[in-house]
Amino acid sequence: MTLRLADMTELLADKVQAELLGNSELLIERLSTLEAAGPNDLAFLSHPKYLGQLAQSAAGCVIVAPSAREAALKRGPCIVVDDPYYYFALVTQLWKRQHFPGAAPAIHASACIDPAAIISPHVSIGAFACIAAGAVIGEGARIAEHCVIGANAIVGANSRLSARVTVADDCRIGERCIIHPGAVIGADGFGFAPHDGQWVKIEQLGAVRIGNDVEIGANTCIDRGALQDTVIEDGVKLDNLVQIAHNVRVGRHSAMAGCAGVAGSATIGAHCTVGGGAIVLGHLRLADGVHVSAASIVTRSLLKPGHYTGLFPIDDNAAWEKNAATLKQLHALRERLKQTEKSLLQLQGSLEEKP
């Protein structure tokens, strides 16, 4: 299937004003990178450091910023917008709607739906999905194969749950959310009281509340709160294999990369990012606009916006072992340095006293 350049810009005109230069009748067959694109492909240039690739690219059309307009025109058709990366994201959404339209709403005969569940119009429910009593499925929602929606849980309008997603009892999913395969929303938080050498379970009586336009990656787990709810605010994006513990609150439009973990009762502000494999310890607070580098361990609250890194740099193993050994002695070296400074000051003082 193809899409005419003029049609593409027209369909997106209500969201972004773009200037189409060159052959507007060009038929786009594929979206691609600058390096791999062919004469009927659309690519994008989002960063000036890749400007050198532009002249070498065989792309039929390239989305560029105004600063790259002249360079792009020298090689052929281009779309000029203020934010090429954002525009390309909109193009991918348009492309998916045009080329991969969803199936018509239907409820599979093998789905198990409690009579007390509320199923809105235009809902799709896949094979062997289970919808418990009191659950509410909003209009236009899609529940894929083998999903489990617990008692009194809510799935908002036009949300999409992929195969094997679990939404436990009393948990709420907002509108237009996307939840990828295997995610578990509302499992018990990790709460136990030590008593006589044993661990006594603390029942997790809260739930999970997820806002609108949230995307949750495959096999990500968001635990229900112990007493209050775990909260994921509007627009949050979680990658695969992210762990959100009980009573955590994640502020609007924050994002976390794969294998990040947030321990219980931590608060992540709005517009934060947490890199892959990073860990935020429990009961800490990250202010709005905090960005944590991959593999960092956050051991204290970060109350000012900014970029934070907390990891030991990679090196060849021999050098790393030497640096690690030195790090173990850092406190002793600090004390020696203080004593040396003290001795030097005393020596300086004695020299100044001499006639």
Swiss-Prot record:
Keywords for the protein's UniProt record, in alphabetical order: Acyltransferase, Lipid A biosynthesis, Lipid biosynthesis, Lipid metabolism, Repeat, Transferase
Pathway membership: Bacterial outer membrane biogenesis; LPS lipid A biosynthesis
InterPro entries: Hexapep, Hexapep_transf_CS, LpxD, Trimer_LpxA-like_sf, UDP_GlcNAc_AcTrfase_non-rep
GO biological process: lipid A biosynthetic process
Active site as annotated: 246 (proton acceptor)
Disulfide bonds: none
A single Gene Ontology CC term: membrane
EC number(s) recorded for this UniProt protein: 2.3.1.191
Reactions it catalyzes: a UDP-3-O-[(3R)-3-hydroxyacyl]-alpha-D-glucosamine + a (3R)-hydroxyacyl-[ACP] = a UDP-2-N,3-O-bis[(3R)-3-hydroxyacyl]-alpha-D-glucosamine + holo-[ACP] + H(+)
Stored Gene3D superfamilies: Hexapeptide repeat proteins, MurE/MurF, N-terminal domain
Highest taxon of the lineage: Bacteria
Listed GO MF terms: N-acyltransferase activity
Pfam family, one: Hexapep
Functional note: Catalyzes the N-acylation of UDP-3-O-acylglucosamine using 3-hydroxyacyl-ACP as the acyl donor. Is involved in the biosynthesis of lipid A, a phosphorylated glycolipid that anchors the lipopolysaccharide to the outer membrane of the cell.
Subunit structure: Homotrimer.
Stated family: Belongs to the transferase hexapeptide repeat family. LpxD subfamily.
Name by which UniProt lists this protein: UDP-3-O-acylglucosamine N-acyltransferase
Organism: Polaromonas naphthalenivorans (strain CJ2)
Source organism phylogeny: Bacteria, Pseudomonadati, Pseudomonadota, Betaproteobacteria, Burkholderiales
Encoding gene (name): lpxD
